[in-house]
UniProtKB/Swiss-Prot annotation:
Record field: catalytic activity: N-acetyl-L-glutamate 5-semialdehyde + phosphate + NADP(+) = N-acetyl-L-glutamyl 5-phosphate + NADPH + H(+)
Principal localisation: cytoplasm
Underlying gene: argC
Single GO term (MF): NAD binding
Species of provenance: Ehrlichia ruminantium (strain Gardel)
Protein name per its UniProtKB record: N-acetyl-gamma-glutamyl-phosphate reductase
Length: 347
């Protein structure tokens, strides 16, 4: 790690963007060259966030169109869906590595993408992006120039589900995912639905069976099970906390499989993981993961015969977004996977 790579963060003023910048500041391999946004050009990040000290990030906000791509090795795109693909179309031949945190390159089937997100300006580039679920696609990520980081809900569902379907331990029908997310998952834009009086002391379900992470989850489960047309009952819920995500997953066991077998399979599958752990006590609370890149999975027998309940928690802004992006960056750079990701979080 004797050299540094020049990095640009596009969308640096959003929650995901500022978390990414915070992590990269502690990365010995990174030199932050550009921070880009669409507003407040020329300002410092400290003018957007009170907890950011003025001298800690001396790089001022730039307009993306004004940056010199020849001075950039890696670009992180922390943009709303539908904006990253326009940038990628212009720069994919000019930048060594692109790590996209939007949904623009997650969905491999263009018709499915259009159904959920609308038109895509460079569908021919979708297959060039590796789906950045780190522990599943580690080898592919290492060899790739382009990575599409998973959504937060998708991460919390797929980390436990992918190995279980691949190993044929649970049925691919009747999968139910009930997920709760902190409000930061809805982004930083001004919206009446996110005002304090609208969310305080309130739990709200939204986009039931219509959330855009559904096709992403179903796509990866089809890949895992080597079959087509796996559908998931997915209910996202907004809870009145800043950050954190907890997913409760309800599954039917294959014949002869017990919850003990499920737990053992997950232990073996993730035995070498630096961030994913099987721990029932820590899995049931977001307190275990806030401010970290960790993911805890708990396995519990269902009251209904031949069923199992799995609980999975992550920090939606870290393992669900910026943390996983840095983890993927580390793999692509052939440096220690945990670099810049082991800082002790606040109490």
């Amino acid at each position: 790690m004797s050299y540094q790579v020049s990095v640009a963060v596009v969308g640096a003023t959003g929650y995901v963007g500022v978390e990414l910048v915070r992590l990269l500041l502690f990365h010995p391999m990174v030199k932050i060259k550009y921070l880009c946004a669409t507003q407040s050009i020329g300002s410092l990040l400290s003018s957007h966030y009170d907890h950011v000290l003025k001298d800690s990030i001396p790089v001022s906000i730039s307009c993306f169109s004004s940056i010199d791509l020849s001075k950039v090795d890696v670009i992180f795109l922390c943009l709303p869906h539908g904006q990253s693909n326009e940038i990628v179309k212009k720069i994919h031949n000019e930048v060594k590595i692109i790590i996209d945190l939007s949904a623009d390159f997650r969905i491999k089937d263009i018709d499915t993408y259009k159904e959920w997100y609308g038109a895509h300006c460079c569908p021919d580039l979708i297959q060039d992006f590796v789906y950045g679920l780190t522990e599943i696609y580690w080898e592919e990520i290492k060899k790739s120039r382009f990575v599409a980081c998973p959504g937060c809900y998708a991460t919390s569902a797929l980390v436990p589900l992918f190995p279980l379907l691949r190993l044929r331990l649970v049925k691919s029908q009747n999968i139910i995912v009930d997920a709760k997310s902190g409000v930061s998952g809805a982004g930083r834009s001004v919206d009446q639905k996110k005002l304090f009086c609208e969310i305080h002391d309130v739990i709200k379900s939204y986009n039931i069976s219509k959330h855009r992470h559904i096709p992403e989850i179903e796509q990866e489960l089809c890949f895992a099970a080597c079959q087509e047309n796996i559908n998931v009952q997915f209910v996202p819920n907004l809870i009145p906390v800043k950050r954190g995500m907890l997913s409760s997953i309800y599954l039917e066991l294959e014949e002869g499989v017990s919850p003990i077998d499920i737990r053992e399979a997950l232990l073996v599958f993730y035995k070498d993981s630096k961030f994913i752990f099987i721990d029932e006590e820590k899995a049931i609370t977001t307190k275990s993961v806030i401010g970290t890149n960790y993911c805890y999975i708990g396995v519990f027998p269902g009251r209904i015969p031949n069923t199992v309940i799995i609980v999975c928690n992550i920090d939606n802004l870290l393992k669900g977004a910026s943390g996983q992006a840095v983890q993927n960056f580390n793999i692509m750079m052939s440096c220690d996977e945990t670099t810049a990701l082991l800082n002790i979080p606040y109490l």
